[in-house]
UniProtKB/Swiss-Prot annotation:
One of its GO terms (molecular function) is toxin activity. One of its GO terms (biological process) is symbiont-mediated cytolysis of host cell. Hemolysin-type calcium-binding repeats lie at residues 730-747, 748-765, 766-783, 784-801, 812-829, 830-847. It comes from Actinobacillus pleuropneumoniae. NCBIfam families: RTX_toxin. Keywords: Calcium, Cytolysis, Hemolysis, Host cell membrane, Host membrane, Lipoprotein, Membrane, Palmitate, Repeat, Secreted, Toxin, Transmembrane, Transmembrane helix, Virulence. The Gly-rich region is probably involved in binding calcium, which is required for target cell-binding or cytolytic activity. This is RTX-I toxin determinant A from serotypes 1/9. InterPro entries: Hemolysin-typ_Ca-bd_CS, Hemolysn_Ca-bd, RTX_C, RTX_pore_form, RTX_toxin/Mannuronan_C5-epim, RTX_toxin_determinant-A, Serralysin-like_metalloprot_C.
Length: 1023
């Protein structure tokens, strides 16, 4: 029996649903097709009653008329019979809704037939309705639902029409839009009232929020929403719609007395997981409360069914976007406080957009979710008690259509919010006479100066200059870009803005716009002019700065609601820098972007042309092409501060000193600053989108191709510091000063008196002709001196030093296990710390040994005037040993002196000392001098160890090896060493990296000077 009743009820409900859906579908179609008629007739719902109509059994014509009048529905009694009237209005007797000249027609016979199809359901509804709304019966409920739905549809269509006209350029006043927006909101409230079940039930909910229920028809928006929270925040027009939607949805969720009163969903307050849970709880509790009021079952099983259906109807995923909007608004508002003090409120404007659209999104999402949950809950309740009601069917039928109308209206509201922001921007620009977005970049820059002041103020001291000219670039700002896109002002913004600031004594100078901004730095024309500055100066690009030129933007439509603001760069081919004329200066171009790729993938580069002054300058170059006219003074070009690629420096064709061509090879592993075009996507609602193109930069490979070459021309540059990669240097016929910096470099001095530094890495350095100075630096280096007098210093590492020609040569091994080869001229050898091997030549050689050195092996192949200087050892601290044909010199360690070969104190091995050379070759060192000036001659050592004497070792002091009491060999030795050093021409003091602040050159890395001074000092002390 129960099953048959259940089947019957389900069948009746399905039938009612089908009729209602069909009616609603017909109504929606009629609305669309009859929009023009509606506007002419007014937004009215008219109940048409034919003269031959008699109400169905169980209903009365008077009830129908009273219900219509209570709801403000016009009643029209026709003189025509039902069939004629139906065909005139609807074309058929089966339709529920249609259009007449006076408004929307509701056919009474068909409506009555729908409501009274099942007597049992009608009676059941009557009891429930009476308990909740007294005389407001099923007829009034159904009429109210249809009336509010149709009103919302018409209001929404009217609103869309007004917006469309405005977009097409027609003069649509704000008051018209405001009225249409308010009408839409009013009809929305009526819809919710119908969906709740009865008007009284909805009034009861709102009454719990202290809003008195005034009239059954809910006529007058102020009466409907009086005393609701947060309404004071709503402005005119669409702002009112936004506020109304928020408070309506909030009141709907929070109406239940058992719900968490602190939960403020969809009213502009944070939506969290807890709130999402309470939404389901509130709706479930409300449905159960209705069942109690209706005297229906509230068993645990029924409650569980209701709760599960409601939970399925409300998806937390639908609220994620809402929560994101409110969180974004919160973050933006906090962020905006930093820049308001600098006169920019764009971030706050953007926050307001997210707040308002978030409120709209929250309201509509919540309303849709609650309507769906309400419909699902009513259906579950009906199933649980084997009863149903026409209102449940009506709710189920119309909620989907209502949701569609709300969603369509949302886009229009979003666009209105965006328009409001655009109007505020226009008002600001009119008042201040300045681009709003440029003002945003100005504020960003002011904050940047505030944040980096400590760093920037240190440049004066760090670079030893009186004035710092600091150039910075505010790159594309996503917040500024988003605001420009939302307000449809993408063509009014730029990719950023470049700034110039001045510091003296660590203090920021007040700028004089005409003098500083326009004259000193012009990024549109690509000009920098420092010629008026009469101080030692640093020009520094602190942040990456875009290529010079003008940006042009064009906004165009790419789809129905899609727009693109395209970027075109009218770029300059070069920067021109006019330097400080009468004072030393530093120019740091390492952050000045020279390489660019446009949106089509075409590559280009911008040259930097520098005209420097008459004093000592330092210039730090980047990865693109440069032309440097350094002028007088000692000028230095640096390539090691950024990745400039694999470099070749060539001065072989130079006609003047300081002329070089620098070729830059940017391979795949070279990462350089390059300018690129990117796109920011901005959405205004679901359908409208803006794309903005802008310039940005990346640090990534930039392989040159298509005939593009990176090449520098250096003029009057006295000194060059290479890159941190493997470089090649080819000197000129003039004096060259090269520094390899890091990397395994190849350096060829060629002609001229060259000064060549390998620095870090395993370098190969050829001095070429001329008096050259070669320093290996760190790493295992190979140094080769050519014709002329050479000074070679291996530095740290296992180095090889060679000289083949030259009258005077200095060979310093430095730390490490080195090999030194002398020439047939006069050589000064100093192997340094480590175990070294030294090959003397046929000329006059001087070998220097210190007690901290390791085991040195000397191969002396000729000459008859060689000297070994024990620079900090006396003869009492050494012993001489004959081992085969070799002479060993051991040094005392810890007071003990041993006379055998395998001994840590073994200092020197002079190979083949006792071996007769071919054709009288002399393998001996003719004189050995200790730190006190005492000396011993080679023949005396040979005689002591002659065959038959039985002596193969002895202490120098014991054998009285020194000649002549009071005779000192050091003065003459000092003269000899000084002659060798001065003859190399390497210590004139006029080279090295420039110290700008001192006003003159500073010898850099001049270990040769250090050694010479050390030798001279030790000899002077001994003398």
């Amino acid at each position: 029996m129960a099953n048959s009743q259940l089947d019957r009820v389900k069948g009746l409900i399905d039938s009612l649903n089908q009729h209602t859906k069909s009616a609603a579908k017909s109504g929606a179609g009629a609305l669309k097709n009859g929009l023009g008629q509606v506007k002419q007739a007014g937004q009215k719902l008219i109940l048409y009653i034919p003269k031959d109509y008699q109400a169905s059994t169980g209903s009365s014509l008077n009830d129908l008329v009273k219900a219509a009048e209570a709801l403000g529905i016009e009643v029209h009694r026709s003189e025509k019979n039902g069939t004629a009237l139906a065909k005139e209005l609807f074309g058929t007797t089966e339709k529920l809704l249609g259009f007449s000249e006076r408004g929307i027609a509701l056919f009474a016979p068909q409506f009555d037939k729908l409501l009274n199809k099942n007597q049992k359901l009608s009676k059941s509804l009557g009891g429930s309705s009476e308990a909740l709304g007294q005389r407001l019966n099923k007829t009034q409920t159904a009429l109210s639902a249809l009336q509010s739905f149709l009103g919302t549809a018409i209001a929404g269509m009217d609103l869309d029409s007004l917006l469309r006209r405005r977009r097409n350029g027609e003069d649509v006043s704000g008051s018209e839009l405001a009225k249409a927006g308010v009408d839409l909101a009013a009809q929305l409230v009526d819809n919710i009232a119908s969906a709740t079940g009865t008007v009284d039930a909805f009034a009861e909910q709102l009454g719990k929020l202290a809003m008195p229920y005034l009239t059954l028809a809910l006529s007058g928006l102020a009466s409907k929403l009086n005393n609701l929270p947060d309404l004071s925040l709503a402005g005119p027009g669409f702002d009112a719609v936004s506020g109304i939607l928020s408070v309506v949805s909030a009141s709907f969720i929070l109406s239940n007395k058992d719900a968490d009163a602190g939960t403020k969903a969809a009213a502009g307050i944070e939506i969290s997981t807890k709130i999402l849970g309470n939404i389901g709880k509130a709706v479930s509790q409300y449905i159960i409360a209705q069942r109690v009021a209706a005297g229906l079952s509230t068993t645990a099983a029924t409650g569980g069914l209701i709760g599960s259906v409601v939970a399925l109807a409300i998806s937390p995923l639908s609220f994620l976007n809402v929560a994101d909007k409110f969180e974004r608004a919160k973050q933006l508002e906090q962020y905006s406080e930093r820049f308001k003090k600098f006169g920019y409120e764009g971030d706050s404007l953007l926050a307001s957009f997210y707040r308002e659209t978030g409120a709209i999104e929250a309201a509509l999402t919540t309303i849709n979710s609650v309507l769906s949950a309400r419909s699902a809950g009513v259906g579950a309740a009906a199933t649980g008690s084997l009863v149903g009601a026409p209102v449940a069917a009506l709710v189920s039928a119309i909620t989907g259509i209502i949701s569609g109308i709300l969603d369509a209206s949302k886009q229009a509201i979003f666009e209105r919010v965006a328009t409001k922001l655009a109007n505020k921007i226009d008002e600001w620009e009119k008042k201040h006479g300045k681009n709003y977005f440029e003002n945003g970049y100005d504020a960003r820059h002011s904050a940047f100066l505030e944040d980096t002041f400590e760093l920037l103020s240190q440049y004066n001291k760090e670079y030893s200059v009186e004035r710092v000219v600091a150039i910075t670039q505010q790159r594309w700002d996503v917040n500024i870009g988003e605001l420009a896109g939302i307000t449809r002002k993408g063509s009014d913004t730029k990719s950023g803005k470049a700034y110039v600031d001045f510091f003296e004594e660590g203090k920021l100078l007040e700028k004089e716009p005409d003098r500083f901004d326009k004259k000193v730095f012009d990024p549109l024309e690509g000009k920098i002019d420092l010629s008026s500055i009469n101080k030692t100066t640093l020009l520094k690009f602190v942040t990456p700065v875009f290529t010079a030129g003008e940006e042009i933007r064009e906004r165009k439509q790419t789809g129905k609601y899609q727009y693109m603001t395209e970027l075109f760069v009218k770029g300059k081919e070069k920067w021109v820098v006019t330097g400080v004329q009468s004072h030393n200066a530093i120019y740091d171009y390492t952050n000045l972007i020279q390489l660019a790729i446009d949106k089509k993938g075409e590559k280009r580069q911008v040259t930097i042309e520098s005209h420097l002054g008459e004093k000592n300058d330092r210039i730090y170059l980047s990865s693109g092409s440069s032309i440097v006219y350094a002028g007088n003074g000692h000028d230095v070009a640096y390539y090691d501060k950024t990745d400039t690629g694999y470099l070749t420096f060539d001065g072989q064709s130079a006609q003047k000193a300081g002329e070089y061509i620098v070729t830059k090879e940017l391979k795949a592993d070279v990462k350089v600053l390059k300018e690129v075009v990117k796109t920011q996507d901005i959405s205004v609602g679901k359908t409208c989108s803006e794309k903005l193109e802008y310039r940005d930069y990346e640090l990534s490979p930039f392989e040159l191709g298509n005939g593009i070459r990176a090449k520098d021309e250096l003029h009057s540059v006295e000194e060059i510091i290479g890159s941190n990669r493997k470089d090649k240097f080819f000197g000129s016929r003039f004096t060259d000063i090269f520094h390899g910096a890091k990397g395994d470099d190849e350096i060829y001095g060629n002609d001229g008196h060259d000064i060549l530094y390998g620095d870090d890495g395993n370098d190969v350095i050829h001095g070429g002709d001329g008096n050259d100075h070669l320093v290996g630096g760190n790493g295992n280096d190979r140094l080769i001196g050519g014709k002329g007098n050479n000074f070679l210093n291996g530095g740290d590492g296992d180095d090889e030093l060679q000289v083949f020609e030259g009258q005077y040569n200095v060979l310093l091994g430095g730390a490490g296990n080195d090999i030194l080869y002398g020439s047939d001229g006069t050589n000064l050898f100093d192997g340094g710390v480590g175990n070294d091997k030294i090959y003397g030549g046929l000329g006059k050689d001087i070998y220097r040994y210190s007690k901290e050195y390791g085991r040195h092996i000397i191969i002396e192949k000729g000459g008859d005037d060689d000297t070994l200087l024990l620079s900090d050892l006396s003869f009492k601290d050494v012993g001489f040993i004959r081992i085969g044909d070799d002479l060993l010199v051991n040094k005392r360690i810890g007071g003990t002196l041993y006379y055998h070969e395998d001994y840590n104190g073994n200092a020197l091995t002079i190979k083949d000392w006792f071996k007769e050379g071919k054709e009288g070759q002399n393998n001996k060192i003719e004189k050995i001098v200790d730190k006190d000036g005492a000396y011993v001659l080679s023949q005396y050592l040979t005689e002591l160890t002659a065959p038959g004497r039985g002596i193969n070792y002895f202490n120098g002091l014991e054998e009285k090896l020194y000649y002549g009491e009071g005779y000192n060999a050091l003065p003459q030795l000092r003269k000899d060493i000084e002659q060798i050093i001065s003859s190399t021409g390497a210590f004139t003091g006029d080279h090295g990296k420039v110290s700008v602040g001192s006003g003159g050159p500073l010898v850099y890395n001049n270990s040769a000077n250090n050694v010479a001074n050390s030798l001279s000092y030790s000899l002077a002390q001994a003398a």
